[in-house]
Amino acid sequence: MRAVSHRRLLLSFLLLLGTEVVMGQSPTDIIRLQTTKAVGEEINIEIAATEGGAFTVEGLNGNEDDGYTVSAQTIVVKGDVESIICYKCDLVQIDLSACHRLRKLDCRGNKLTTLDASAVDSLQWLACNDNELTALNVDNLKRLSELYCHNNKLTSLQVSTNEALTQLYCATNALSTLDVSKNAQLHVLICHQNQLQVIDVSNNAALIQLSCAENQITKLDLSHNAALKTLGCGVNKLTSLDVSRNPALETLLAYENGLTNLDLSKNPALQRLSVGNNSLTALDLHQNPLLTQLKCKQNNLTDLDVSGLEKLAVLDCSDNQLTRLNVERNAALSTLRCAGNQLESVNVQPNVWLVTLDVSHNKLAELDLATNTMLAELYCADNQLTSVNLESNTGLRTLDVEKNKLDSLKLEANTMLAGLACGHNAIKTLNLSANVRLKELYCVDNKLETLDLTNNTKLKMLHLDSNQLREISWANFGKLYSLSLVGNQLSADLLSQMLDALPKAPEATEEEQTSFKWGVADISENPGTANANTTKASENGWKVVAKVSTGIQTLRPNEAEAYLRYDQVGAMLHATAAVAKIALYSIDGRLMRQIEAGQEGVSLRDVPAGICVAVAYSRSGKRLASLRIAR
């Protein structure tokens, strides 16, 4: 069946009446599309004719208004076509060799391995990103102004003849070279995640945005780019960066390089700065009063003056060597992360808009949060806090107070709380009756004897190891997918009742069971462990672990200590010689990174605050141990 479209048919007819020229005298454009969609399957194609033009379509049933279905896997478009949008149509081939009027082609998200557009000299806009392209020919397209070819497999790209190009997106390919010296009109160049060692933009004076992050660039000359507003050059091999000729710069992302100093005195328009994971020993921000975001974590800073940054909303200066930090004049702060320093005090009373506060791994003995009524996330683990008053923080959703000196924790006012980590303290009682939204509870290594969870029916993870629990009350464990009660004083009857109350176990891989205890109920080392009835829980798909102690020796050794050790002070993860690889997971099972184990240890300073799990593997790929780490 042939689908026919006419635009302004009456106008075309009148024009033909007034001239002897007929449409048949002009060459007919032909575009062929090959799809793997089955005959009868819906396909989303939008085709627009030129002004006064018409086209026919073979291989499709239907029309643009009601939608098309495939009648043949080779689709042929003939006529005066100005634009084709064939996004996610399972195309494996596009033939443009007989096409000369097309201005716009959108073939994103298909299965193309090659694309030759060189015959379409009228083309102005081409989006072929998110395919499997190993070759792309755009030679001699003098009118092409925008090219989007990112997320492909290109090893080379020639754009020297595309002199009208203003925007080039070629990120996430395998390019080792890129010549843009002939593209003087280029405004936007996005080439991150390639294999570039050099990027020369000296002839691109009109450049406003440059993203060349995650390459292998060692030097970057920006002296000819005075109009530059946004620069992303993170994760390269830069040891120096000169931005003194870029007065319009508003965003600078230069994280994960080898920078030892950075002069920002000529960048008064700067609003966003990210220079984390470098080797900076100082950072002068006196000439950057417009900064709203400052990320300078994991450097060697001993001092940081942010007193002149009244617009600052986000500050992350974690993992430096700061002994003091004054944020009293930063009233607009909504996020403050200063974990992993040597702070003995921090005053956040003027910061009434704070939503996220991370002061973990410092030397704080007290923390006043009375004025921070907007606080939703609080991380203050590994300090020297003996108490923490959260009565004013009624919107708190996440709380991590692990590894302090707390003997009590009052949470009656925190009715929004969903995640609580309070392990490794000396807490004797814990009232959770008001925390009805609680989903995750980590309260290991405390001194709890009883715990009432009657109102906590949304719990998904419940870890209460190494307490003195004799009694636990609950109403419903219907959402639970991880239970750990190791090393308490629980009877066989109580353990049996808790196991019987478990729902169907969640589907979990062996890795998820081992590292995150998904679908695992561990009741080891309790007085009632040996006699607990595990039948129903096992029938519900739970992996029940019920190891028992034999006096001083235990049949359940600490597997982690034989392979992994975490140094909290230096944020270093050390592995024994048997470990070849370490995988880091978030607590919800997301793989964050894989690391080759070494004798010097692995730095975790750039790992986000919170709880993660390190899993050790041998050279043969065998899993050796897992270690839960609080950052």
Where are these regions (language model features)?
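Residue-level detector of functionally pivotal "anchor" positions at catalytic/ligand-binding pockets or at interdomain
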Residues: 547-572
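Short, glycine-anchored, charge-dense loop/turn motifs used at functional sites
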Residues: 584-592, 612
